[in-house]
Amino acid sequence: ISSLIEKEAKSDQDKRLVSSVILNRLDNNLKLQVDATTIFSITKGKYKLKRDLNYQDLKNKDEYNTYFIRGLPPLPICYVNRKTIEILLENYKSEYLFYFFNEQVQKHIFSKTYKQHKKLLEEYRKNE
């Protein structure tokens, strides 16, 4: 879990919220749908994807692609900073189940419901 957080978030606060989303999704038996795992799967661990992810990427049948599998990948996807592990062990609580990274404001946007997530994503894409 900590390797997913490490790749998904940069700030400590975002790491707390991303960790809570991952734990909430695991608790609710939802697919994690973490982009970093899909990038890891496509690039075989190189992480240098010179384009945006697309729908076909998300359907990639690989044990590391959390859009395809349910639960965690078989192994970590990167080395983890000690601080990230400490943040995960805080077991930060939220009601969030979804998030995306807003490039314009350089931060993650979190939501509790799929309906809210979809609406926020649509607004973001209109302003791109």
PLM feature spans:
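Bacterial extracytoplasmic/cell-wall-associated proteins, especially those involved in peptidoglycan
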Residues: 1-128
